[in-house]
Swiss-Prot record:
Top-rank lineage group of the source organism: Eukaryota
Organism of provenance: Gallus gallus
Positions of Ca(2+) 3 binding: 294
Compositional bias annotation for Acidic residues: 759-770
Name of the featured protein: Cadherin-1
Length: 887
């Protein structure tokens, strides 16, 4: 047995077991090690390259273990100018200036048990500056970046504390390319084959291919020159996978910072800057600000920090350094005294901007400074005495123009004049303004002047500039004499608006009031006459001499011309000046109400059902005013109460209803309403009775029926009217059927005597045989308006008669043609119904027709022409034409 234990195999076995137990115990002890909450350090220091720190600038990171199982914590800084993210990154909340000093503050955080921990943070400027011209920072970049370990006992703590330092790469590096930056390695590369790759901007995202990684070795390389002004920072993710493509590490973030090189010179925002400064300005007065920008880094380096300086000044008088410039801000200000616009109106400066705080690249621009005029010369009146004449009652009239001279620059505020009336301007009667083109003062009347009140004004005017004088000097003054001219002014009513109370029942012709005007021109002693200018209703008359107003018609408060019981009339007053003028006054008659209107119902028609009707409510309207209105009384007139009822409801309502059922139709109801003073009014209201029950809807209109009469009475009235019409018709027919006895056209044959019978005396004798035939009338032809009523109207066309000729020689043809037309007229009666004769003189002394012949016998008389005169002269032709045959 001793040999067994003494064998080498048995001797090594306990040692192996012991080592295994120690390893297991060590791991268990490590796993069971408790988490220690708190900050990784008591103090943290962060540095910045310059005093000015921009808002949002990340300063660094603090490390804190909360032992809560979360990879983040809540941090509270005591300085509100800073903030701390959940991952411990400290940054500025707003722009910050250090002024060469350090800022310290405390950060608090709580662990999982609620215990409060603190750490001190200090922020200061890093004095050692590097300009980064051509050297690079490869030696500051770690040669190898290893993926974080993932051991179970340290996974959580290592993930929280692992900070990958940024990789720096200088822009514009000459290479050679590709150039290695850093090597990425995984702890698993000893266990199995690991392949590396990168993703992100510059790798597989635009710009693609700037960064590459060797697949097997993990070397990260840059393939071309970088430009910080385009992209100053690249963020990549590195990946490690096995030969089968399975990830062996979590992706690791890699930040590549492009370091600045001073490859950009400052650029002014303008090539020429223009500024203005007043002459005699004191040293230190700001003139203008020039500004230049630099694309290089001004945060971590001095490459973008610009410094300003003045290279030259033209002209160099009164000395070559009249201005200075702030190197940091570019503010140009006055350095010396003696600026004079009259000698040197402007200066030209060459301004230079240099980066690296004045030690690097530079650029220039031009600054032109205009010296403006200062108010060192007062305006002076030339001349100092003025006179003006203006008519009264003309506001805005120019009185005079005041001229001044000023030695300052024309158009400048130091030259522009401002005028003031110092004295004599009673009640603000005048105003003065400045002519902007000539700088003269224009004196005007601010309101109408009154000659009778004041006929002369003595004004004192002063002048100054818009800007105050640079030195105390007495102001220049001028005197203005203004004379007011008298003009004929219109009469003025006193008061201009007169209110008069008058009852509306004022008798016609009675005086309403007296409304007179006064003439402002007392010295002219003019006569004033009055007349109505506006009298819409024509109610008034004004006496032209004394202005007494009387009523020409009854006044009516309820008229449309009386608004709110007020009647407005315009009265005119005219003087007899040359030219005459007219004044206007307003007369307001406050009409006092009288009880002249009876109450009436509204509306004056309604519809109602014949069965079980609802009462109709009408409004009572009284145009008068209280107490000439309610309470009202209502009654029915002219028999309307037989069928209808009426009653007063409330203050001004009238309820109407049916007393009994009526036939459908339209009825007239006579309603009498009486007001509280006994004024009554009977009004006819139309009611449409409908064949319905209850409320009347879509009422069909029937025949018109008087409110107090029934159907039998109406039928009786209509029957009487019809009988009267029949009687009148019978009388007319009887009158037309009476026979008219006609007298014979000619006397019987046995009634013939020696002389012509039944001829009217036509007058005239031998002395009347010579007369003008043109003076004869043409009977009915000359009287076309005369209508024949002894025959029936013809059914055929009437004959055409020839008009009387103008030549007397054609009178024979005229008579023959018209006789023939009359004989052939079928509508002519056997005798003329109307003969019109001209007066031919006195009565004839001849006792018989035989005396017409001068010879003793009628043998030389030829009566044959009587046979040619037609049927009307046939009997006469037989009497005188047949004598020879008888013998």
């Amino acid at each position: 047995m001793g040999r067994r234990w003494g064998s080498p195999a048995l001797q090594r076995f306990p040692v192996l077991v012991l080592l295994l137990l120690l390893q297991v115990c060590g791991r268990r002890c490590d796993e069971a090690a408790p988490c220690q909450p708190g900050f990784a350090a008591e103090t943290f220091s962060f540095s910045v390259p310059q005093d000015s720190v921009a808002a949002g600038r990340e300063l660094g990171r603090v490390s804190f273990a909360a032992c809560s199982g979360r990879p983040w914590a809540v941090y509270v800084p005591t300085d509100t100018r800073f903030k701390v993210n959940g991952d411990g990154v400290v940054s500025t909340k707003r722009p910050l200036t250090l002024y060469g000093r350090k800022i310290s503050f405390t950060i608090y955080a709580q662990d999982a048990m609620g215990k409060r921990h603190s750490a001190r943070v200090t922020v200061g400027r890093h004095r050692h500056r590097r300009h980064h011209h051509n050297h690079h920072l490869q030696d500051t970049t770690p040669a190898v970046l290893t993926f974080p370990k993932h051991d179970p006992g340290f996974l959580r703590r290592q993930k929280r504390d692992w900070v990958i330092p940024p990789i720096s790469c200088l822009e514009n590096h000459r290479g050679p390319y590709p150039m290695r930056l850093v090597q990425i390695k995984s702890n698993k590369d000893k266990e199995s084959k690991v392949y590396y790759s990168i993703t992100g901007q510059g790798a597989d995202s635009p710009p693609v291919g700037i960064f590459i990684i060797e697949r097997e070795t993990g070397w990260l390389e840059v393939t071309e020159q970088l430009d910080r002004e385009k992209i100053d920072r690249y963020t990549l993710l590195s990946h490690a996978v096995s030969a089968s493509g399975q990830p062996v590490e979590d992706p690791m973030e890699i930040i590549i910072t492009v370091m600045d090189q001073n490859d950009n010179k400052p650029v002014f925002i303008k090539e020429v800057f223009v500024g203005y400064i007043e002459e005699n300005a004191k040293p230190g007065t700001s003139v203008m600000t020039v500004n230049a920008t630099d694309a290089d880094d001004a945060v971590n380096t001095d490459n973008g920090i610009v410094s300003y300086s003045i290279v030259s000044q033209q002209p160099p008088r009164p000395h070559p350094q009249m201005f200075t410039i702030d190197p940091a801000k570019g503010i140009i200000s006055v350095l010396g005294t003696g600026l004079d616009r009259e000698t040197t109106p402007n200066y030209t400066l060459i301004v230079q901007a240099t980066d690296q705080e004045g030690k690097g690249l530079s650029n220039t621009a031009t600054a032109i400074i205009e010296v403006t005029d200062a108010n060192d010369n007062i305006p002076i009146f030339n001349p100092t005495m003025y006179e003006g004449v203006v008519e009264e009652n003309k506001p805005g009239t120019e009185v005079a123009r005041l001229t001044v001279t000023d030695q300052d620059a024309p158009g400048s505020p130091a030259w522009q004049a401002v005028y003031h009336i110092k004295s004599g301007n009673l009640d603000g009667a005048f105003s003065i303004i400045t002519d902007p083109s000539t700088n003269n003062g224009i004196l005007k009347t601010a309101k109408g002047l009154d000659y009778e009140t004041k006929s002369r004004y003595d004004l004192v005017v002063t002048v100054e500039n818009k800007v105050p004088l640079s030195v105390p000097i007495t102001l220049s003054t001028a005197s203005v004499l203004v004379t007011v001219l008298d003009v004929n002014e219109p009469p003025v009513f006193v008061p201009p608006i007169k209110r008069v109370g008058v009852p509306e029942d004022l008798p016609v012709g009675q005086q309403v009031t007296s409304y007179t005007a006064q003439d402002p021109d007392r010295d002219m002693r003019q006569k004033i006459t009055y007349r109505m200018g506006s009298d819409p209703a024509g109610w008034l008359y004004i006496h032209p001499e004394n202005g007494i107003v009387t009523a020409t018609q009854p006044l009516d408060r309820e008229s449309v011309h009386a608004i709110n019981s007020t009647y407005k009339a315009i009265i005119l007053a005219v003087d007899n000046g040359i030219p005459d003028t007219t004044g206007t006054g307003t007369l307001l008659l406050l009409l006092q109400d009288v009880n002249d209107n009876g109450p009436t119902p509204e509306p004056r028609s309604f519809e109602i059902c014949s069965r079980q009707p609802e009462k109709q409510i009408l409004s009572i309207v009284d145009k008068d005013l209280p107490p000439h209105t309610y309470p009202f009384k209502a009654a029915l007139e002219h028999g309307s109460s037989n069928n209808w009822t009426v009653e007063i409801r409330g203050q001004d309502e009238l309820a109407m209803g049916l007393k009994k059922e009526l036939e459908p139709g339209e009825y007239n109801i006579f309603v009498k309403l009486t007001d509280s003073q006994g004024k009554a009014q009977v009004t006819q209201v139309k009611a449409q009775v409908c064949e319905c029950e209850g409320t009347a809807k879509n009422c069909e209109r029937r025949s018109y029926i008087v409110g107090g009469l029934g159907v039998p009475a109406i039928l009786g009235i209509l029957g009487g009217i019809l009988a009267l019409l029949i009687l009148l018709l019978l009388l007319l027919l009887f009158a037309r059927r009476r026979k008219v006895e006609k007298e014979p056209l000619l006397p019987p044959e046995d009634d013939m005597r020696d002389n012509v019978y039944n001829y009217d005396e036509e007058g005239g004798g031998e002395e009347d045989q010579d007369y003008d035939l043109s003076q004869l009338h043409r009977g009915l032809d000359a009287r076309p308006e005369v209508i024949r009523n002894d025959v029936a109207p013809p059914l055929m066309a009437a004959p055409q008669y020839r008009p009387r000729p103008a030549n007397p020689d054609e009178i024979g043809n005229f008579i023959d043609e018209n006789l023939k037309a009359a004989d052939t007229d079928p509508t002519a009666p056997p005798y003329d119904s109307l003969l019109v004769f001209d007066y031919e003189g006195g009565g004839s002394e001849a006792t018989s027709l035989s005396s017409l012949n001068s010879s003793a016998s009628d043998q030389d008389q030829d009566y044959d022409y009587l046979n040619e005169w037609g049927n009307r002269f046939k009997k006469l032709a037989e009497l005188y034409g047949g004598g020879e045959d008888d013998e």
